UniProtKB/Swiss-Prot annotation:
Homodecamer; pentamer of dimers. Binds only one seryl-tRNA(Sec) per dimer. It comes from Shigella sonnei (strain Ss046). It comes from the Bacteria. It catalyses: L-seryl-tRNA(Sec) + selenophosphate + H(+) = L-selenocysteinyl-tRNA(Sec) + phosphate. The modification N6-(pyridoxal phosphate)lysine is found at K295. SUPFAM superfamilies: PLP-dependent transferases (SSF53383). Its cofactor is pyridoxal 5'-phosphate. The lineage of its organism: Bacteria, Pseudomonadati, Pseudomonadota, Gammaproteobacteria, Enterobacterales. Pathway: Aminoacyl-tRNA biosynthesis; selenocysteinyl-tRNA(Sec) biosynthesis; selenocysteinyl-tRNA(Sec) from L-seryl-tRNA(Sec) (bacterial route): step 1/1. GO terms for biological process: conversion of seryl-tRNAsec to selenocys-tRNAsec; selenocysteine incorporation. GO terms for molecular function: L-seryl-tRNA(Sec) selenium transferase activity. This is L-seryl-tRNA(Sec) selenium transferase.
Amino acid sequence: MTTETRSLYSQLPAIDRLLRDSSFLSLRDTYGHTRVVELLRQMLDEAREVIRDSQTLPAWCENWAQEVDARLTKEAQSALRPVINLTGTVLHTNLGRALQAEAAVEAVAQAMRSPVTLEYDLDDAGRGHRDRALAQLLCRITGAEDACIVNNNAAAVLLMLAATASGKEVVVSRGELVEIGGAFRIPDVMRQAGCTLHEVGTTNRTHANDYRQAVNENTALLMKVHTSNYSIQGFTKAIDEAELVALGKELDVPVVTDLGSGSLVDLSQYGLPKEPMPQELIAAGVSLVSFSGDKLLGGPQAGIIVGKKEMIARLQSHPLKRALRADKMTLAALEATLRLYLHPEALSEKLPTLRLLTRSAEVIQIQAQRLQAPLAAHYGAEFAVQVMPCLSQIGSGSLPVDRLPSAALTFTPHDGRGSHLESLAARWRELPVPMIGRIYDGRLWLDLRCLEDEQRFLEMLLK
């Protein structure tokens, strides 16, 4: 060991001496004596490695307290951090899908702070059913006889098939054998549920007679799957639920539908593309309809099944139901969200998902123009900051081919180097409230469709 190396090692402080420093008092109060000591030991080991490998001290050795504070602050951050979604995808699966209405947030907070009547009947002073209140709401909204709630729509499909078709065949059109994110495939779910898939028709065309010829003594269900995350166009033919229900009645086979995204209102009244609604399928005679709570419905992650009382009873009594049931926070948020649908005239203001989807391109354009000047002044030395038209998407497999006119702030490096865009995007991801945009066509795009808090936006970007 050289004299210089020995000198560097000798400059490393003792932990006891560091802890006596006044700058460590608040750190010990905030993070605890044990964790601070543990980190200091780790940092001393790191410093010794740096000395051994590069014959120098780490830069942070000049201020140990500052480095400890920085590391512990980062460590204390929640893994689920709030971000500003400027990707242009409203229901972004990776960013948590639907924002919750204030009423839902308050309901969840109350359910977390206090005992609640989750499975307690106040009238009878006895055990109740956790789905009962929501089932009544869902029946009122959809016209169904009964309802069942589980933790997501994949679980809803699994339960629906396991409880009604295990050991039997389920007839599905080849054009509806969907795969959604995470490699969730209808054929795989059927195998897990103990069903046998009976494919009929072709990818682009399926006729009523295809279903008719497939039905045999072992057929349990005729199933429709809404292809919410892709579209087949051109020379196509599909059987709608009303026609399939008529066939099912003739053959004494019930019809079920996996609706996927599941809107409870006619979106066309807001100028958006129309999606099939559970109440339409219930009116058509479908026995069971499953859909998601956190997509177009705008609530928490949940799987909702509505339909005929006798079939819902089979779902409720199946062993899987307990494994898949929703917890009190989910039920509280979902109930509060569903109650908003009882007052449709205020829905587009009180339901964040609908509010964001219905923002006009003109309003977003004005917002972008208002924000462009301060950002250009701050970033103009390196980037051209412009207002550009763009197209938002709904996301989460909803209305996959439809786009919503929007406006974005774009950042283009003056030197044309893509690495500068990557660096800027990385800097924004490191902000106290990370900013998530997208890089496309030599620009960094910030689609403002989902931006409602302009003050926080500017506070972050002008740091």
